[in-house]
UniProtKB/Swiss-Prot annotation:
Keywords: Activator, Cytoplasm, DNA-binding, Metal-binding, Nucleus, Repressor, Transcription, Transcription regulation, Zinc. GO terms for cellular component: cytoplasm; nucleus. Residues 1-14, 36-47, 105-114, 280-295 have a biased composition (Basic and acidic residues). This is Glucose transport transcription regulator RGT1. Residues 170-179, 186-207, 310-329 have a biased composition (Polar residues). It comes from the Eukaryota. Residues 132-142, 251-263, 296-309, 369-380, 942-953 have a biased composition (Low complexity).
Length: 979
């Protein structure tokens, strides 16, 4: 070490004349590197060649060791770019600095920096000792095993010559060091107890050197995950990773791989758990990768590094004056950015241990005293200094399987089938040899985090929303404030990447663009699923979609319907030549480009549906004016080709009905009276909700309910001129009004009964799984539970006290053990919150109308003439009596349904603002004759027939006012929102 120092000092004097002639004669007063003991105690180390043991170690009776990984050193004092030494001199000098007298680092100085190292595969699939026995998946005839869907690096680049398949292993192992840089594994989680799988932990050694990217080569790139340098693995090491870039090995090597490596998960979509998880999913997970929210460094550097939630977010949790039902008190702005002075204040407040800690802890204890145990435990965990938003709790493959089993069959937020998504779209280039690998990795990272956020929020809690698990563990996302912070973080990170995406738009593949835009679709789905009003997310999503020119794809031709299997094979073969490139492959066929265009059109359709839902639910103006009737029919066609949404025809019908509901919502939001003053008489163009088969789908029943409610409102508003007149209600008018009310109540009852049968909590429940469909394959060693042994959620109440209530509705809902299960059993929907809230609002408006109308009809019976009138009156009274019976059942069903996650919604009739808005609407839209009441009330006019005619007119007048009040309230809901 001294010899190399004496050689480098004269060269430094020659190379850096600014340092002066005395630089060569100056001796260093301290060692170049402190020993481990001095570094730990942060004391001065006087270790040298002449003194093998420093003073501190000599006093403690220890020896100087240098086993810690050396940190990167900065430039020398007086360094300038003009005085930068040549590359060879800098390398030798850097090697001399890292030199020490320890035997551990004897070979470091002579080791070149460009040593060939190997690109590590996905480390979470490394088998562990003592794991579950290997399970061979049962695949469909001719199907290919699925590869790992995130960050699967390719083995080639567009400027490199593609080697043969037989020499693939040697080609990868013989690459130079610059091509063998890779990222740390992004998923360090163990197996989820939601599914019987064993995911292994990354057990290899940590990298000994961290190399940063060249600042001159990435000026326009983002500060994304740090590149890690790994050691060369032994030969055959890659055979343990079935989802790495080596999955393209020959068939013989793949068979050997299956014999030596343990398969960590089934490839099927429907796999019943080996043991009922009950309340134990997410019980014990290995530490996942943490969120980097509020970090001053790279937004995605080393995803496995922990980070704490900032105290500015915790303040809303610990405040006693915070309203738990309003999100504005928790997060007034959707995207807060902590500033450096705030961070310094937080550090200083965390360091103070004096008089502040005692009162603060006492206040927190008192504030949680009157709260339920589960809620206080959630807030205590969320507000603790060690709380953090940890992603990676669900393994990647299980995350995709949960989505396609519980979420996709009801509403395809990712509008593509499972095989195409996992085997094609998610296989993008993340190797550092690509100029856009950082962008690809960043987009995949937050796409995965957004999907996990959706799944974790949708998972059913054992004792209802916001309850603690049996082992005391609580998911931090059950906290309202933490959920809002997690949602805002995912949205902010994906928006921040948009300038870089526009800058590299010509270099990005269509796959990456689809994944990026699908992330916005997932975030808008989460907002609709929990019923949270955040118009900023939807507005920015529309802006991003317009920036990407997605509306231009609407004029392109659609993919041919006769999508044959042979043409797909030709398409895949043609795309295989440029399969790994991060740039758009110009050699693709026109049909392959049309396939991606179909995906972009579907994403645009889904965004229009979310826009329409938010417009109707919260009463905001519609942002996209594109009609959906013809666009949905063209874009979402049933097929079994590569670019289809769903290959099962029954599941596709459920998806289609959800899109039809989007058409009705779009029509209602565009046809508001506040926008168009004239009365709307036309019905939506697509009348598919009148189909008998559509009554078995909740979205179709909700669309039918909305149309019936709108038509009834229009009919009732036509009676507004008669409100203050002397005309009495006729029997025909009463019969028409009664028919509309009874039909609306019947639709409400059928819709709630169907929700109760399918999924009363609108949650992902392992005990209430969708039925096994055609094309789903399970493992031969796994015993599938019978349908009778896997009851729907309606028979498995979350609380024991509600068990009797659920048993009452077994016969009502037809939940017999041998009955065929519903095709949408166990699936979740983004419309359930809006359905339940709007039915509760309408119930408050119409629940007294049947009784009032029956009273009027009974009073009119003595005055009726003819036997026909008597029969019609009896039938009318009978239908109104049945409606009253259904109202009682509707009230019970609403009390049993628990779709609310973390936000509660107050009835519109109980809001003070609703009464004011209804009064203003009546003043604006009511006829002039109604605004000016008549001088002589109709109730005081003498009756021509008998003494009881005055009482009859009074009852009719009361019914008239009740009907018109309900009509104005219904109009207020349509104009200003349901929630």
């Amino acid at each position: 070490m001294s010899a190399s120092r004496r050689e480098s000092e004269p060269k430094e004097a020659e190379t850096s004349p600014e340092a002066g002639g005395a630089a060569s004669d100056r001796r260093r007063s301290k060692t170049s590197r402190a020993c481990d003991q001095c570094r730990e105690k942060k004391t001065r180390c006087d270790f040298s060649d002449e003194r093998p043991i420093c003073s501190a170690c000599q006093r403690m009776g220890k020896t100087c060791t240098f086993e810690r990984v050396p940190m990167k050193r900065g430039p020398t004092k007086g360094y300038t770019r003009n005085s930068e030494p040549p590359e060879g001199f800098d390398t030798s000098r850097r090697g001399s600095r890292k030199r020490s007298s320890s035997d551990v680092f004897k070979g470091d100085a002579g080791r070149p920096r460009a040593d060939p190292v190997s690109l590590p595969p996905l480390a979470q699939y490394l088998p562990q000792s003592g794991s579950q026995p290997r399970l061979q998946p049962l695949l469909a005839p001719g199907a290919q095993p699925q590869q790992q869907f995130w960050k699967v690096p390719y083995y080639e680049y567009q400027h490199q010559r593609r080697g043969s398949i037989d020499s693939l292993g040697s080609d990868v192992s013989n690459r130079n060091g610059s091509e063998q840089l890779a990222y740390l594994p992004s998923n360090a989680s163990s197996g989820s107890q939601f599914y019987p799988a064993s995911q292994a932990q990354y057990a290899s050694q940590l990298p000994s050197d961290v190399e940063g990217a060249n600042p001159e080569d990435c000026r326009g790139s983002l500060s994304l995950p740090a590149i890690q340098k790994f050691q060369q693995p032994p030969s055959g090491y890659y055979l343990q990773y079935p989802y790495s870039q080596f999955s393209m090995l020959p068939q013989q090597q793949q068979q050997q791989q299956q014999q030596n490596a343990q398969q960590s998960y089934f490839t099927s979509q429907y796999v019943p758990p080996a043991a009922p998880p009950g309340a134990e999913h997410f019980k014990e997970f290995d530490e996942g990768f943490h969120s980097r929210k509020g970090s001053d460094v790279s937004v995605a550097v080393s995803p496995s590094s922990p980070v704490q939630v900032t105290r500015t977010q915790q303040a809303g949790l610990n405040s006693e004056s915070r309203d738990t039902n309003t999100a504005t008190a928790v997060s007034p702005k959707p995207l807060p950015k902590p500033s450096k002075p705030q961070m310094q204040t937080e550090r200083s407040s965390s360091k103070s241990d004096g008089n502040h800690n005692g009162p603060r802890k006492q206040k927190r204890k008192n504030s949680n005293r009157n709260k339920p145990g589960s809620q206080s435990s959630i807030e205590s965990i969320a507000s603790s200094s060690h709380a953090s938003i940890i992603y990676g709790k669900i393994p990647d493959k299980q995350l995709i399987d949960i989505y396609f089993e519980f979420i996709h069959p009801n509403f395809p937020v990712i509008p593509i089938n499972k095989e195409t998504l996992t085997d094609d779209l998610l296989l993008v280039n993340t190797q550092p040899i690509s100029p856009v690998h950082e962008l690809n990795t960043y987009i995949l990272h937050w796409f995965r985090n957004s999907l996990e956020l959706l799944v974790r929020v949708a998972l059913k809690k054992p004792s209802g929303s916001g309850q603690a698990y049996s082992d005391g563990a609580v998911d931090i996302l059950d906290s309202q404030a933490t959920f809002i912070n997690a949602l805002n973080e995912c949205f902010q990170r994906i928006v921040d990447i948009h300038p870089g995406l526009r800058e590299n738009e010509k270099l990005l593949s269509l796959k990456t663009k689809f994944i990026y835009l699908a992330t916005f679709s997932i975030l808008n789905y989460i907002l609709a699923f929990v019923g949270y009003d955040n118009s900023f997310v939807l507005g920015m999503s529309v802006t991003i979609y317009n920036e990407c020119k997605l509306y231009r794809y609407l004029m392109y031709d659609e993919l041919p319907s006769n999508d044959t299997e042979a043409s797909e094979n030709e398409d895949e073969a043609g795309a295989g030549d440029a399969h790994a490139s991060g740039t758009p492959e110009r050699g693709k066929s026109a049909k392959h480009d049309l396939g991606h265009q179909v995906l972009f059109k579907r994403l645009y359709v889904l965004l229009v549906v979310f826009d329409s839902l938010q417009s109707c639910a919260f009463g905001v103006p519609k942002l996209i004016s594109v009609p959906l009737a013809e666009l949905t029919e063209e874009t979402f066609k049933f097929s079994t080709g590569k670019w289809c949404v769903e290959r099962d025809p029954q599941r596709f019908e459920t998806i289609r009905q959800s899109l039809v509901l989007g058409q009705v919502l779009s029509w209602l939001s565009i046809s508001r009276k506040s926008v168009r003053r004239n009365s709307l008489q036309a019905a939506p163009q697509d009348a598919s909700w009148k189909d008998e088969k559509s009554d078995s789908v909740s979205s179709s029943l909700f669309a039918k309910f909305l149309v019936q409610k709108h038509e009834m409102m229009e009919d009732f508003l036509l009676l507004a001129p008669l409100e203050n007149s002397s005309h009495l209600l006729t029997f025909d008018l009463l019969s028409k009004s009664s028919t509309a009310i009874c039909g609306l109540i019947s639709s409400m009852h059928r819709l709630l009964a169907l929700l109760m049968k399918i999924n009363p909590t609108n949650s992902v429940d392992p005990n209430n799984r969708p039925p096994l469909r055609q094309g789903d394959f399970v493992h031969t060693d796994t015993e599938i539970q019978s349908e009778s042994s896997n009851p729907p959620a309606a028979t498995a109440a979350p609380d024991s006290c509600d068990a009797d209530k659920f048993d009452v509705y077994r016969k009502l809902l037809g939940l017999n053990g041998g009955q065929e299960r519903h095709v949408a059993q166990g699936t979740i929907s983004p419309f359930v919150i809006s359905i339940v809230v709007e039915i509760r609002n309408v119930l408050e408006l119409v629940k007294h109308l049947p009784t009032s109308i029956i009273g009027v009809v009974v009073n009119l019976l003595p005055n009726g003439e003819g036997e026909n009138y008597q029969k019609r009156s009896h039938r009318l009274v009978m239908s109104l009596s049945n409606a009253m019976n259904e109202l009682v059942q509707i009230t019970s069903l609403i009390s049993l349904l628990k779709p609310f996650k973390m936000f509660d919604h107050t009835l519109r009739s109980n809001r003070p603002s609703a009464k004011v808005s209804t009064k203003l609407l009546r003043q604006k839209f009511a006829p002039e004759s109604v605004k000016t009441p008549s001088s002589q009330p109709p109730s005081s006019s003498p009756g021509p027939n008998s003494d009881g005619s005055n009482n009859t007119s009074l009852s009719q007048n009361t019914v008239m006012h009740a009907i018109l009040d309900a009509a104005w309230d219904l109009m207020d809901g349509e104009e200003l929102g349901w929630l």
